[in-house]
């Protein structure tokens, strides 16, 4: 890793400096604070996961060791809602379908959670989903709909609408408080 960092500092940053050492995180699992899960219908059911290597085929993954355990609970809840309400997954090849991605963020210090649904239009019976999610965890502070109608593999569009709760979640990093939206890096 040290060599990779040094090479990238030189090649990409134009900096001729040496990284002294890489300090590993003591937390090997559950350290990610953001996940973007593409949607797909697999065996007749809504599933979220990650793209298989070098493809846009979704490999279902309810629980990823890099994400906190509660992300899996949110994934399962949204899958159940979609199956119970006939919500279709967007298909990049045909341009048809409603739900494109499930996007989850959390603030590590604040404990606040943002759930963002990326869809091509309005989600039917979304009030039911809001009740399911907010009944599941009091840490969910924001549920947002991002409408992305474009024929693109870019996940988010500029059109975000808060369905429930706050527009952003907050977190503290290095003593500074940040407001985090779905479109934050």
Segments predicted by a language model, with ranges:
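Accessory RNA-recognition modules of RNA-modification enzymes
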Residues: 1-185
């Amino acid at each position: 890793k040290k060599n990779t960092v040094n090479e990238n500092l030189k090649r990409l940053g134009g900096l001729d400096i040496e990284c002294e050492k890489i300090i590993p995180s003591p937390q090997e699992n559950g350290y990610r604070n953001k996940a973007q899960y593409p949607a797909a219908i697999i065996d007749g059911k809504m599933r979220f996961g990650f793209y298989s290597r070098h493809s846009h085929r979704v490999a279902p993954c309810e629980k990823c060791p890099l994400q906190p355990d509660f992300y899996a609970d949110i994934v399962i809840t949204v899958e159940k809602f979609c199956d119970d309400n006939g919500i279709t997954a967007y298909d990049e090849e045909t341009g048809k379908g409603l739900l494109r991605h499930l996007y989850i963020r959390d603030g590590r210090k604040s404990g606040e959670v943002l759930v963002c649904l990326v869809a091509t239009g309005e989600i039917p019976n979304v009030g039911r989903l809001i009740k399911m999610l907010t009944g599941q965890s009091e840490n969910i502070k924001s549920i947002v709909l991002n409408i992305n109608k474009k024929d693109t593999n870019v996940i988010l569009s500029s059109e975000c609408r808060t369905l429930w709760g706050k527009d952003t979640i907050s977190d503290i990093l290095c003593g500074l408080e940040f407001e985090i939206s779905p479109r934050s890096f």
